[in-house]
Structure formats: C-alpha cells, structure tokens
C-alpha cells in the first residue's frame, strides 16, 4: 500500500500568496482531518478541517468544501485565514520578526490512521526588498524599498496603539511599492499620546518623500487602518501632493 502524501505548489511564499495543497494516496472515501498550526509573532494559531477523499484517494483542499472545521465553504486558503488563537503562553517573537519567515505545519490524518504532512514557510519581506530606519528631519519610521524602480509610494500610518506596524510596509514593498511606515506618536521623540498632533509633521513627511530620487513624479498615496484611516482621509483632503488614499 502506498503511503499517504501531502504536496503544495509553493513551499515558500509571500504571506498573501495563495498556495494549493493536495493530499493523495489516502483510502478512497475515507474522511481526512487536516490541521494547520503556526506561531505568528507572539501567539500560536491553529485551523482544522475534515474532508472526504475521492475515489482516487485524493483531497484537493483548494477545490473541496470541508465536512466540518474552522471554515465551511470552498476556500483555497481556509486553513490559513480561519486559524484561531490557542490559549498557550505568549511566545517571544524573534527580534527581527519581519525579516524572519514563519512556518505553518500541515498535518493530515485519515480515519484509519494514514498520515501525511508538510511544512510551509511564509514571508513578509520578498526577495530583494530593503528596510532602513528613518530618524531624521523630525521623522521616525521604517522605509521599505522594492528591488528596482517602485511602481508608486505609500505612506503607511499606524492605528490608535501608536505602534509601527512594519508588516504592511514590508508587504507593499514586496509587491513593488516604496512604503514608509511613519510613526506619529508613542515613539521616542514624538508626542506620547494621540492628542495635539501637528499636521505640519505630516507635511514634512510628504515633502521628504517627494525629495527621494526614486519617487520622481510617481503617485504618492497614504494608507492607514483604524484611527490611521481617519488620519489618511484627513491628509488626503488637506495636502495636494497626496494622490490617493486607502482607509
């Protein structure tokens, strides 16, 4: 009897890239429970779905709806987006976690004990992307640049927590955009709270971006979630050098 197998089209991929997971050589018609476990930043996450193998003993996760699990409809990435946080102790993330691929362990177990598994690596920072600290001209943040000329540039704003959410800039640069993760409070040298933030500081950031030789006359956008989304809308309505807003 052939041992059950698990395969995937991309073992290493960007965090937002779809992958196709296939299970083969399970007993035909058998139910197969698939578990995907990962540690992301400081928490452990897990998703689970049960499928029925077809007459050839195959399960195509991208094309089959699970019989049960943490998601219910056909979804190629269901085992990723439906993951639930496990009640484990907090794990200390790597110091440079944005630069560090994280692993997702996929395990499939048939009702009669057949097993297969694989490990995937997910990346926030694509090949050739560079990251540099910006602490000049009154600005604090991270600048992410893609290899080659950028398609456009984005000023990335954090939300009400005041953190510099590097992963957004890393992902944008991995898709060809220059991204400046701009801090505007709760960082050294900046206001402690989200009060009385002068708009002039954002004008300074926009002018700084426009001076960069790689930007030229390319589009400059601003993006932010949560309270950062409110700020992005305000900046787009205030400064004509902002060409696009996502909030």
Model region roles, listed by residue range:
Residues 9-14, 19, 27, 45, ...:
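N-terminal cap/lid segment of alpha/beta-hydrolase-fold proteins
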Residues 174-189:
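Conserved alpha/beta-hydrolase
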Residues 35-87:
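Ser/Thr-rich low-complexity repeats and stalk/linker segments
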Residues 150-159:
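Short beta-strand element of the alpha/beta-hydrolase
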Residues 160-171, 184:
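The serine-hydrolase catalytic nucleophile loop
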Residues 163-167, 207-247:
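Primarily recognizes the serine-hydrolase "nucleophile elbow" in alpha/beta-hydrolase
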Residues 186-217:
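Catalytic nucleophile-loop/oxyanion-hole region of alpha/beta-hydrolase
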Residues 1-11:
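Short, compositionally biased P/S/T/A/G/V-rich stretches that sit at domain boundaries
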